[in-house]
Curated annotation (Swiss-Prot):
Residues 1-22 form the signal peptide. This is Submaxillary gland androgen-regulated protein 3B. Pfam families: PROL5-SMR. Belongs to the PROL1/PROL3 family. Keywords: Pyrrolidone carboxylic acid, Repeat, Secreted, Signal. One of its GO terms (biological process) is regulation of sensory perception of pain. The lineage of its organism: Eukaryota, Metazoa, Chordata, Craniata, Vertebrata.
Amino acid sequence: MKSLTWILGLWALAACFTPGESQRGPRGPYPPGPLAPPQPFGPGFVPPPPPPPYGPGRIPPPPPAPYGPGIFPPPPPQP
């Protein structure tokens, strides 16, 4: 019985480290080939519009500061 356990253990260990039917051969380089050049925007082609600065689900950028380093705030209005 001990030899049967030893043989089944070796068989299970070998099954873990040998390629099975579901495994493929070695993988090739990624990407498989050179990428295609981008489409030129010539006559008859219109470039896509730029994405909106903000939209649904996006937070709009903060407004610029009224003054920053080296720029003084405007003087108060005189009556």
